[in-house]
């Protein structure tokens, strides 16, 4: 099959412009969240601890926020955990606690900084994939980074919920169960665990009364089953 000429089919200047617009318009600090700190503790206990990762495993926390996952892993004596994020305030908070945080686009981790193919043991991707405008590229990049049979934890908001995650300013990919499973299969991952969690939450907004809503998340553990033949 003859390959398409990318110089004719893709406007790289426009792609760069669109990305810069997203960065300047829609990146903001998560800030402290008692709910997400509590949920992260439960996630690590339920999904990460049973993996029995080596203490020197290379671990990436994509979209690390203020560093709640990094806190948990530090308490467990993991020695090689790196956060990735673009929110200046959250990065500053995480670094103030002694964590290493890199300012990378989570879909494109630079090889020139030493992030070679199959160099990572585990990726933590909690409430980050929905922020990717191109989730299939994001998952392709994580396939590149992960060692063969490396693991990844994914947690994403479910579509069509009371909370209307689709309308959050920096949410671009609120994936349903089938679409998420299909993307993982196409990018070389095997789903080991696919759970749905639901709970009641109180939403607080400035100058508005508190609102009770149903939250619904998908929680997955996946394994890199095969590398992608895209070179």
Which sequence ranges carry the predicted segments?
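Conserved S-adenosyl-L-methionine
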Residues: 189-200
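Conserved N-terminal segment of class I S-adenosyl-L-methionine
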Residues: 1-118, 122, 137-139, 215-219, ...
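Core SAM-dependent methyltransferase catalytic element
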Residues: 202-231
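A short SAM/SAH-binding and catalytic strip from SAM-dependent methyltransferases
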Residues: 122-133
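Short alpha-helix
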Residues: 172-187
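A short glycine-rich, Lys/Arg-flanked "PGG" loop and its adjoining helix->strand segment in the class I
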Residues: 136-148
């Amino acid at each position: 099959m003859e390959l398409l000429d990318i110089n004719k089919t893709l406007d790289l200047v426009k792609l760069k412009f669109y990305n810069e617009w997203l960065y300047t318009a829609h990146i903001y600090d998560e800030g402290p969240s008692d709910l997400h700190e509590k949920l992260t503790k439960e996630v690590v206990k339920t999904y990460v601890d049973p993996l029995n990762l080596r203490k020197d495993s290379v671990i990436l926390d994509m979209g690390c926020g203020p560093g709640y996952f990094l806190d948990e892993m530090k308490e467990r004596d993991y020695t090689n955990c790196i956060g990735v994020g673009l929110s200046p305030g959250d990065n500053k908070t995480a670094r103030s606690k002694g964590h290493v945080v890199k300012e990378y686009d989570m879909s494109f981790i630079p090889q020139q900084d030493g992030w070679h193919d199959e160099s990572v043991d585990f990726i933590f991707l909690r409430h980050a994939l929905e922020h990717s405008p191109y989730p299939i590229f994001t998952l392709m990049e994580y396939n590149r980074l992960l060692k063969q049979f490396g693991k990844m934890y994914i947690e994403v908001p479910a579509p069509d919920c009371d909370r209307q995650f689709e309308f959050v300013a920096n949410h671009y990919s609120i994936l349903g169960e089938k679409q998420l499973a299909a993307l993982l299969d196409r990018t070389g991952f095997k789903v080991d665990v696919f759970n749905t969690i639901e709970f009641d939450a109180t939403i607080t907004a400035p100058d508005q009364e508190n609102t009770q809503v149903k939250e619904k998340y998908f929680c997955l553990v996946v394994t890199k089953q095969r590398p992608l033949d895209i070179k």
